[in-house]
Regions:
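Hydrophobic helical membrane-anchoring modules
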Residues: 1-13, 150, 172-252
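Short loop->beta transition adjacent to catalytic acidic/histidine clusters or analogous donor-positioning motifs
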Residues: 15-18, 35-45, 53, 63-64
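Short, well-formed alpha-helical segments that are part of the catalytic scaffolds
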Residues: 23-39
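Donor nucleotide-sugar binding loop of glycosyltransferases
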Residues: 26-29, 50, 73, 99
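Acidic helix N-cap motif at the loop->helix transition within catalytic regions
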Residues: 28-32, 52-61
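A conserved acidic beta->alpha catalytic loop
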Residues: 47-55, 96
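Acceptor/aglycone-binding surface of glycosyltransferases and processive sugar-polymer synthases
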Residues: 69-71, 75-83, 100-177, 204-214, ...
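Short aromatic/hydrophobic "clamp" motif used to bind/position activated sugar donors
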Residues: 89
Length: 252
């Protein structure tokens, strides 16, 4: 099913950065998230079959709404990537667990040619921000990623930035939970420089669609195992270190 994009009438033709926000029943969190999109950037809320009025609320708050009927985190993310037109594309969860204003230094690093793909390493803030089963699954995946690619990353979090052309060139195919991992694996295989920086991780609004239970977590791990089983492509690996992204940054 082809994604359908609807935009506010006042939206500019171009934006320096597009922020893809995969969304499934996140109406409660949307005001907080969209208020933190840096000024001048475009929010692409990808509605993945919400029944709580998320699409209508996002549109009322000035976001561009992309409808993707095929369920799946990867399907929503890729629909947003395909709808994006900016040179640099960011991704952020839509559940108020991550502040999109923290993407500003990520974008600056990509724009200045210091890295090709910048990831946020989640640092839990308060009890319940990152359940034990989700942390365990993430730790296991980080180890498998290191063995597969040589990248010494600590997290495969959803907060990230890269050039749109680089992401499209990766030919991403996963449409489920493996999409974020496949992006990193194929970036490493292609020799892209991958950086990881600390970001605060807040308790999310509502229940997780992926890692809210042990069953959901390990289903995601199985999805990602399939990604890691892909044969390596020719290329090199480059990973850089971490720093704590400044909080509250909202402009380039």
């Amino acid at each position: 099913m082809k994604a359908v994009t609807t935009s506010p009438a006042t939206e500019p033709d171009t934006a320096p950065v597009d922020v893809v926000l995969p969304c499934l029943n996140e109406a409660e969190a949307l005001p907080w998230v969209l208020a933190r999109i840096p000024r001048g950037w475009r929010a692409l809320v990808v509605d993945n079959g919400s029944t709580d009025g998320s699409a209508e609320r996002a549109r009322a708050l000035g976001a561009t709404v992309v409808r993707e009927e095929r369920r799946g985190f990867g399907a929503a993310c890729h629909a947003g990537l395909m709808a994006a037109t900016a040179d640099i594309v960011c991704f952020c969860d839509c559940d108020a667990s991550l502040d999109p204003s923290l993407l500003v230094p990520f974008v600056r690093e990509v724009r200045d040619g210091e890295a090709d793909l910048v990831l946020g390493r989640r640092r839990p803030q308060g009890r319940g921000a990152w359940p034990a089963h989700a942390r365990a699954g993430n730790l296991a995946l980080a180890g498998m990623l290191r063995r597969r690619t040589g990248l010494r990353l600590h997290d495969l979090g959803p907060l990230r930035a890269a050039r749109r052309a680089d992401l499209l060139a990766l030919g991403l195919t996963d449409r489920r939970s493996g999409y974020p991992l496949q992006m990193v694996v194929r970036a490493a295989d292609a020799g892209l420089r991958v950086a990881e920086h600390d970001v605060p991780y807040l308790p999310r609004t509502g229940a997780s669609k992926v890692t809210g239970t042990w069953r959901g977590t390990w289903q995601a791990v199985r999805d990602m195992r399939r990604v890691l089983a892909e044969p390596p492509a020719p290329g090199g690996v480059s990973a850089t270190g971490s720093f704590s992204a400044p909080q509250g940054a909202n402009s380039l």
